[in-house]
A protein has these predicted regions:
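N-terminal catalytic or cofactor-binding beta/alpha core of small enzyme domains
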Residues: 1-104, 108-113, 122-133, 140-160
Length: 160
C-alpha cells in the first residue's frame, strides 16, 4: 500500500495497461516500492531495454499540485534521491548508471503532489487523480516517439 499521492505511478501504469495500444515489445510495470530491485536487475542484465519511463509523484518547489512535467534524473528532489535504498544505492543512482553506463534512455514523467500523508492512506488526491490522463498521454507520446524512431531506422537501413 502506498501513501496517498505516492500512488501516482501505479495509477498511471494501471490506466495505460487498461488502455492498451502499445507494441508487443513494451512492458508496463507497476513497480510500486520494488523499483530498486527491478532497476538493479536491469543494470546487471546482459539484455536491457532501449528506454525506461519512470512515472512518479514528486514535490518540486515552484510547481502546482497536479502539474505534469518531465524532469531530468539530475533534477530529482533530494527527498526522492535516497528513497528506499537498495544496498545503499539510491534509485536515482541506478537510473543514472543505466543511462550513462548501460546506454538506456531514462525518461521521468512526474506530477506535483498535493501532499504525501504521514501514514498509509489509500487513493490519490483530486488534483493527482485528474493528472493521471495527462501523464498517460506523455508516456504514450514517448512510446510513439520510440516506435517512430525504430521505424525510421529500419526504413533507412535498406537504402544506399
Amino acid at each position: 500500500m502506498l501513501f496517498g499521492d505516492d500512488g501516482f505511478g501505479p495509477a498511471v501504469a494501471e490506466q495505460i495497461i487498461r488502455r492498451g495500444g502499445f507494441s508487443d515489445d513494451v512492458a508496463v510495470l507497476d513497480a510500486g516500492t520494488g523499483v530498486r530491485e527491478i532497476l538493479f536487475d536491469i543494470v546487471l542484465s546482459e539484455t536491457r531495454p532501449e528506454k525506461i519511463i519512470v512515472v512518479d509523484g514528486l514535490s518540486v518547489a515552484g510547481r502546482s499540485p497536479g502539474e505534469v512535467f518531465m524532469i531530468s534524473i539530475d533534477d530529482l528532489p533530494e527527498n526522492k534521491r535516497d528513497d528506499f535504498s537498495l544496498h545503499q544505492m539510491p534509485t536515482s543512482n541506478l537510473l543514472k548508471e543505466l543511462n550513462s553506463m548501460c546506454g538506456v534512455k531514462v525518461v521521468v514523467v512526474a506530477a506535483q503532489v498535493e501532499g504525501i500523508p504521514p501514514e498509509v492512506a489509500p487513493g490519490l488526491s483530486g488534483m493527482l487523480a485528474g493528472a493521471v490522463p495527462r501523464a498517460c498521454g506523455m508516456v504514450m507520446g514517448e512510446l510513439a516517439e520510440s516506435e517512430s524512431s525504430v521505424r525510421a531506422d529500419a526504413g533507412g537501413a535498406g537504402h544506399a
